[in-house]
Each structure stands twice: as structure tokens, then as C-alpha cells.
Amino acid sequence: MTTNTVVREAQSQAEYNPLAKQKAAAKLSRIPIKVEHGEALKKPDWIRVKAGSPTTRFYEIKDILRANKLHTVCEEASCPNIGECFGKGTATFMIMGDKCTRRCPFCDVGHGRPDPLDTNEPLNLAKTIAELRLKYVVITSVDRDDLRDGGSGHFVECIKNIRELSPLTQIEILVPDFRGRDDRALEILKAAPPDVMNHNLETAPRLYKEARPGSDYQFSLNLLKKFKALHPKVPTKSGIMVGLGETDEEILQVMRDMRAHDIDMLTIGQYLAPSNSHLPVRRYVHPDTFKMFEEEAYKMGFTHAAVGAMVRSSYHADQQAHAAGV
């Protein structure tokens, strides 16, 4: 099989607009790696999503989100489970805009110079959650390397507003790594800690340079360990993708590293390339292998492990949390 190397030439200064949201090829043209593509692997039957007809609830949620100028990672990251989750009245809200300061080549969230924070967003988010009568919410964000606190203060404002309007709603936050600002961010989060603290490791350390440029494996592990030391009763959680070129043993070692850093909950799912411009799928992991990962997770002491081809970090997050005793 012949492998074609796609070398993405940098856009000229005249073409590049840092204020515009860049997606796919436009986003990845300026990263310092070569994205190599061979013949695309055929998707096996076990990873196909059952497409259902959009429900009234699906459209209701989309209308409410647009009316309140809110974003979901479900939409921005092209999650394959969006139909099911929206249809059941659940969503993962993405705060601080829809332009990320990073250019991870596995991710479909747009890149660009972020807009100033919307000071009305925490209240709008809280009103939306109350209107939808959600009992469990996940709040994530784009990376905001432009902010001195990495956006941690905005997370706190969102949590406070949600608890004011929906005191019984449980809140999971899926945070960026707060690169270089972790101690400041953790200090700020003390004002309103979540019910579950989630930060994804994404892949094995060997693949970080390719998959997570600008991030550091040990830094991400330490972020969750530091949070756990400050809030020992709050469950910590992390997720891994498979299919980027890692081995089974590398996944097991990441799991061991997670437990060594006091991470309680785990998600593992199959990586699916959002477009032909993104990192290609190197392998499709068989359900039997996912089952092995799940069994090993419980042997290692994880309180809950959601493992399977279509599992995503916030997929059935409420069920994951409740199974872990939240």
C-alpha cells in the first residue's frame, strides 16, 4: 500500500485571519507536524451509530441554545452521539466561545483568536439549565491560553450561577490543562468546586507531540492529582482515545498512571477522524479489547469505567457519576 504524505503549506499572512474560526484543513495548515494519510481503514460494524429521527426535544434544545447564545461540544466537536443525547435532553455545554487557542489535529473544535469573555454567559447558561430542567450537566471549554487564569474564574461563575438557579443539579466540569496557570486555576476553583472534576489525557505520552502539541502528559496527570489533594471527596475523571497508533500496553500503562495520580473514573472510546485533514484512524479496536480494558480498569481500582467504541468523555456522564456514587 502506498502512503501519500500530505504536507500542508503555511498560509500566507495575507490569507491568514487570526480572528476567523478555522476548521479542518485551515486550522491544521499551520501546525508543526506533517499529517500523513494512507488508504482509509474501513469502519467495522461495531462502531456504526444508529441514526434516529430528530425528536421534538432535539430541536427544542437547539433552539434554546441559539436563543441564549450558547455552544455545545456536541455540535462543535461533531460528536457521533449528538442525536441520542439531545433527544434525551442532555448536552455538554462549551463555555468561553467556540475558538480554541490550540490546534490539536484530532479535534474538530475551531481554532482562532478568541473573543472577549461574555460576562452574561454564566447567567444565560444557568437560565438554560433551569429551563431544560437538567439534573446533571457537563461544562467544558475551549483552551483559553490568552487568559491569565486560563478561564478558571469563568468556570467558577458558571458553577455559582447554576447552583443559585438549580441547587439540586449536579455539575461536572471538563477542563483544559490550564498550562502554566494550574496553581492559580486550582486556587480559584476552591470558591466553587464541581461535583466531578474531569480532564482528559487523550492518548499515550509517546503520541503527545503529534496529537496534543502544546500539552504535556505529566502536567495533565499532576493537574488532577493536585485537585484531588485539595478536594479528596470530589471524584476525578479522565478519558483516553484509542486508534491513534498506540498499543494496548500503552493504554494499560496510561490507566496505571491515572490510578497512581488518584484518578477515580475512566472513559475509553474509539477515535474517529472528523475529516480527511485530521489525524487518520490507525486501528479500530475490537469490542473484546474494550472489554479487557474495562476489566483491567476495575482490577486497578477505578470506581467506574465507561469503555466502548462509541463512548465519549461526557457520554452518559450522569450514569457514570451515579455508578461511581456521586
Curated annotation (Swiss-Prot):
4Fe-4S is among the record's keywords: yes
EC numbers: 2.8.1.8
Assigned GO CC terms: cytoplasm
Annotated catalysed reactions: [[Fe-S] cluster scaffold protein carrying a second [4Fe-4S](2+) cluster] + N(6)-octanoyl-L-lysyl-[protein] + 2 oxidized [2Fe-2S]-[ferredoxin] + 2 S-adenosyl-L-methionine + 4 H(+) = [[Fe-S] cluster scaffold protein] + N(6)-[(R)-dihydrolipoyl]-L-lysyl-[protein] + 4 Fe(3+) + 2 hydrogen sulfide + 2 5'-deoxyadenosine + 2 L-methionine + 2 reduced [2Fe-2S]-[ferredoxin]
Cofactor (UniProt): [4Fe-4S] cluster
Transferase among keywords: yes
Family from the record: Belongs to the radical SAM superfamily. Lipoyl synthase family.
Name the record gives this protein: Lipoyl synthase
Protein's organism: Delftia acidovorans (strain DSM 14801 / SPH-1)
